[in-house]
Amino acid sequence: MQKGLILYMGYYGRYTAAYSIGCLLMLSLYIAGIFLHWAAFGVLLVLTLAGVMLLAVICSVLGTRRFNAAYQRFLTSCDAAAFLAEIRGCQRWQNRSTRPNLALNESFALQALGRGPEALEALSRMGMDRVPRRSKSCLQQLRLSVYTRQASIAIGLEDYAAARSQLAYLRDEVRTLPAGNALFGHFSKAVLDLEHMMAVQRGEPGGHTAYFRTELGLAPNSYLRAQASYYLACALLLEENDAAGAVPLYEQARALAPQLWVAARAGAALNALHAREAAQPSAGI
């Protein structure tokens, strides 16, 4: 039983250590009861087992909450380097249960830093064949997340053949979900996002300005606002040739996420716009 509970520990060594120490203390109490022939031996056994399980739940919840808080800080601050450092610290204590989520988040952080090949390598280290047996829905969510991340990275690397392949897998997997399922709504939206992003990067017009304007208005954090600002600026140039409208959006993307890929892309786009303006002949008087 203890091995199974330890398998689902949280992400941090302090909680694993607290669990181990607590288990040792309760085991010591249990052994003492055996040697001292306490009358309440049966009650002590039940309390020891209950204490072990309760401690496992508490430590797992605390570790998961702390990791989720680090993820939210990243989305708010766009400090991918700090989030990556947090993940690397957790990986020292990873197990079969925490490895998939850590690999997905490591891949996300590396992609945000513009390190696409390393992000793909992080996903490959996850090893779907080593993922523990879980419920069918958990495994399906993991597959959906991997397809989404691989498609997103491929788009960033401008490997559109790979992106289309991963999007096809993602669409096929989404079709197997019931329409009212929460995963259906989330990953159907992910498919739309990725399709619009890829089309904008490939220079294929098709209602992207309206889509990303809506995305920018609904973006709940700095990371998504920076991403939506960048793609809205690209869409304005593509569909409306609106350089005046694109410039402040590129600048906003750089200001929101100065250390991330989106800032580098926005900076390159601004430089290209300025070069184009400089190359245009000035109007005569």
Annotate each predicted stretch with a short phrase:
Residues 29-47:
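Membrane-interfacial hairpin junctions
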Residues 40-46, 71-88, 111-129, 159-173, ...:
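Helix-turn-helix repeat elements of alpha-solenoid scaffolds
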Residues 44-74:
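Transmembrane alpha-helices and immediately adjacent membrane-cytoplasm interface residues
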Residues 65-69, 98-108, 112, 142-152, ...:
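"A position-specific structural signal for the A-helix of alpha-solenoid helical repeats
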Residues 88-96, 129-140, 173-185, 216-222:
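Flexible helix-coil transition and linker loops at the boundaries of alpha-helical arrays
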Residues 149, 155-221:
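Alpha-helical adaptor scaffolds
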Residues 201-285:
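Long, non-transmembrane cytosolic or organellar matrix-exposed soluble domains/tails
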